[in-house]
């Protein structure tokens, strides 16, 4: 039985952001991200007091239509495209870790409804996401 992993899902296609607990298995990531190829990147989230998190993302998000930005930096530049799942940093064995309740609140405070030229009504997007 796989361990459970608590993270924040930013689903740009269904236009929602929410905490979600999943099994820490590859198929679970494919299912919640609605994709067939993932990548895991480390990004700092926040303004002055940035904190590092791992972000599981759709590695082929740019090839999907419509292309929807899921994360931007402090200047509004796109960082990630497609659905994303944000977790804690990896442990000493390289395994993803769950978010704390504080981390969930912190991340959700950085998710805002943002508009783009193609999507003028806006949808949830992670802001203040940087290298």
Q: PLM features: what roles do these ranges have?
A:
Residues 2-131:
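Domain-length accessory/inserted modules outside core catalytic folds
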């Amino acid at each position: 039985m796989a361990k459970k992993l608590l993270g924040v899902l930013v689903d740009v296609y269904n236009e929602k952001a929410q905490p979600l607990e999943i099994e820490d298995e590859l198929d679970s990531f494919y299912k919640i991200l609605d994709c067939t190829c993932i990548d895991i990147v480390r990004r700092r989230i926040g303004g002055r007091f940035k904190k590092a998190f791992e972000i599981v993302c759709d590695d082929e998000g740019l090839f999907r239509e419509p292309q929807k930005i899921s994360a931007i930096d402090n200047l509004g530049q796109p960082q990630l495209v497609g659905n994303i799942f944000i977790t804690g940093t990896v442990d000493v064995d390289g395994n993803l870790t769950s978010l704390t309740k504080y981390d969930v609140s912190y991340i959700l405070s950085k998710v805002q409804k943002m508009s783009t030229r193609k999507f003028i009504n806006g949808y949830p997007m992670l802001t203040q996401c940087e290298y």
